[in-house]
From Swiss-Prot:
Residues 98-336 form the Radical SAM core domain. It comes from Shouchella clausii (strain KSM-K16) (Alkalihalobacillus clausii). Its EC number is 2.1.1.192. NCBIfam families: rRNA_mod_RlmN (TIGR00048). [4Fe-4S] cluster binds at residues 112, 116, 119. This is Probable dual-specificity RNA methyltransferase RlmN. The lineage of its organism: Bacteria, Bacillati, Bacillota, Bacilli, Bacillales. InterPro entries: Aldolase_TIM, Elp3/MiaA/NifB-like_rSAM, Methyltransferase_A, RlmN_N, RNA_MTrfase_RlmN, rRNA_lsu_MTrfase_RlmN/Cfr, rSAM. S-adenosyl-L-methionine binds at residues 164-165, 196, 219-221, 297. It holds the Pfam family Radical_SAM. It is found in: Cytoplasm. The gene is rlmN. PROSITE patterns: RADICAL_SAM. CDD domains: Radical_SAM. GO terms for cellular component: cytoplasm.
Length: 356
């Protein structure tokens, strides 16, 4: 039977777990330090923790529950990791290098059921949720890589934008955020963390009430219901009116800016008309809104969709700017590897099917 990842415990949970079994509170602090500051990969390396405590941890938990299966490195320094989980499933994690530090994009589910018509992640439907420990371990695996190559750098930013819908795995995602923010551990600043949702409106309300101080991004991709329902089936459950109500609640509750992700697809959602509709949709919340324009990464299985022409991207950007909307065109990473989210995993799963 597979052991639970120790990375899945918050500091409070680890403390309670050890104290319930007769150990002093300071033991949890020691273990936490070994895990996240000294970054050991075995319990035996925790030299100042007594043998009884180490044996208890060894009997119940694992530090490593996934292994590197494939790694792709881009000329721009982006690295895409494909990790194999204990049950044989594969997940993607991406390391991106920026002027301001190292950012990691994590996955929250094995597959995705949101079913956006342009996305590689949904080519393989959801198998299961990841545990909070499996999400944290993605960060640790990337940090181990940075340690090994001697960069003397740390993961400074996290985006929860990999395969899956984070708000469909809500509690594990929230626990993950608490663990990586802990100031005695990885100490990743809340304002350096962004969680992206396809628009589960009821969970946006819940997320707002938690006041976590992390950034929220919403995958919008269309400014009206007719178009959004056509390319994102989630819109049928949470149409734009409901989605915007939840976003407005989030803004009022947190006074934090919301980022709207908008993938530009040629002749689908990249016209001036859509840019004007988007500006109108954001309306008087423009001071706490930012539109992230993303040139589409073509996917073989969705050949009906193509990247917008540079002229269309410029026109869309200029139209938003003239309407007073804060926006930018996302700097691309890993264009010479399987850049689209879910692309590498999908290719590897197809290879497994052919072999079998």
């Amino acid at each position: 039977m597979s052991k639970e990842s120790i990375y899945g415990l918050t500091m409070a949970q680890l403390t309670d777990w050890l104290m319930e079994r007769g150990h002093k509170k300071f033991r949890a602090t020691q273990v936490w330090d070994w895990l996240y500051r000294k970054r050991v990969t075995t319990f035996a390396e925790m030299t100042n923790v007594n043998k009884d405590c180490l044996q208890l941890l060894e009997d119940h938990f694992a530090i490593e529950t996934m292994s590197e299966h494939v790694r792709q490195e881009s000329k721009d320094g982006t690295i895409k990791f494909l990790f194999r989980l204990q049950d044989g499933n594969l997940i993607e994690t991406v390391l991106m290098r920026h002027k301001y530090g190292f950012s990691v994009c994590v996955t929250t589910q094995v597959g995705c059921n949101i079913g956006c018509s342009f996305c590689a992640s949904g080519l393989l439907t959801k198998n299961r949720d990841l545990s909070s420990g499996e999400i944290v371990e993605q960060i640790m695996k990337v940090q181990f890589h940075l340690d090994q190559v001697g960069k003397e750098e740390r993961v400074s930013h996290v985006v929860v934008m990999g395969i899956g819908e984070p708000f469909d795995n809500f509690q594990n995602t929230v626990d993950f955020l608490e663990i990586i923010k802990d100031h005695k551990g990885l100490a990743i600043g809340a304002r350096h963390i962004t969680v992206s949702t396809s628009g589960l409106a009821h969970k946006i309300y819940e997320f707002a009430d938690l006041k976590l101080q992390v950034n929220l991004a919403v995958s919008l991709h269309a400014p009206n219901n007719e178009l959004r329902s056509r390319i994102m089936k989630i819109n049928k459950a949470f149409p734009i009116e409901k989605l915007m109500d939840s976003i407005n609640y989030y803004i009022e509750k947190t006074n934090r800016r919301v980022t709207y992700e908008y993938i530009l697809i040629k002749d689908v959602n990249d016209h001036k008309e859509e840019a004007l509709q988007l500006a109108e949709l954001i309306g008087d919340k423009r001071h706490l809104s930012y539109v992230n324009l993303i040139p589409y990464n073509p996917v073989d299985e969705h050949s009906q969709y193509q990247r917008s022409e540079p002229e269309a991207i410029s026109q869309f950007f200029d139209t938003l700017k003239k309407k007073g909307i804060n926006c930018g065109v996302r700097l691309e990473h890993g264009t010479d590897i399987d850049a689209a989210c879910g692309q590498l995993r999908s290719k590897q799963e197809k290879k497994k099917v052919k072999v079998n």
